[in-house]
Amino acid sequence: SVGTSCIPGMAIPHNPLDSCRWYVSTRTCGVGPRLATQEMKARCCRQLEAIPAYCRCEAVRILMDGVVTPSGQHEGRLLQDLPGCPRQVQRAFAPKLVTEVECNLATIHGGPFCLSLLGAGE
């Protein structure tokens, strides 16, 4: 089923969206590597685009909060408290990665939004 395939190692790569980690921290707080923000955004969007539309919201959720795989491995939860950049601020932005202003990618909801993650950063 769709739900069971949206796990790391199946429709979602292991530790998905690692490029998005730095894009999110740079975009929300101006902290992170000294790469051009547009290049970081392009890398993040490419990683997100490579994930099937029906799993993109789950991949963003894993980036935000992590997951324990069926084999017991902890994956994701790449957003961490950074000096001057609290994790909650990054979590509030992460669901916006699929929106028109950011990567503009369709999801399981049929458009560029993750209904299941709205308000997740609050």
Curated annotation (Swiss-Prot):
Q: Name one GO cellular component term.
A: extracellular region
**What is the organism of origin for this protein?**
Eleusine coracana
Which Pfam family is one of those matched by this entry?
A: Tryp_alpha_amyl
The UniProt keyword set, sorted, is:
Alpha-amylase inhibitor, Disulfide bond, Protease inhibitor, Secreted, Serine protease inhibitor
The record's principal subcellular location, in a coarse class, is secreted
The molecular function GO annotations come to: alpha-amylase inhibitor activity; serine-type endopeptidase inhibitor activity
Where does it localize? Secreted
Organism classification: Eukaryota, Viridiplantae, Streptophyta, Embryophyta, Tracheophyta
Membership in a protein family:
Belongs to the protease inhibitor I6 (cereal trypsin/alpha-amylase inhibitor) family.
Gene3D superfamilies membership: Plant lipid-transfer and hydrophobic proteins
- Report what the protein is called: Alpha-amylase/trypsin inhibitor
Q: What does the tissue specificity note say?
A: Seeds.
Could you tell me which cysteines form disulfide bridges? C6-C55, C20-C44, C29-C85, C45-C103, C57-C114
InterPro entries annotated for this entry? Allergen/soft/tryp_amyl_inhib, Allergen/tryp_amyl_inhib_CS, Bifun_inhib/LTP/seed_sf, Bifunc_inhib/LTP/seed_store
What function does this protein fulfil? May play a protective role against endo- and exogenous hydrolytic activities in the Ragi seeds.
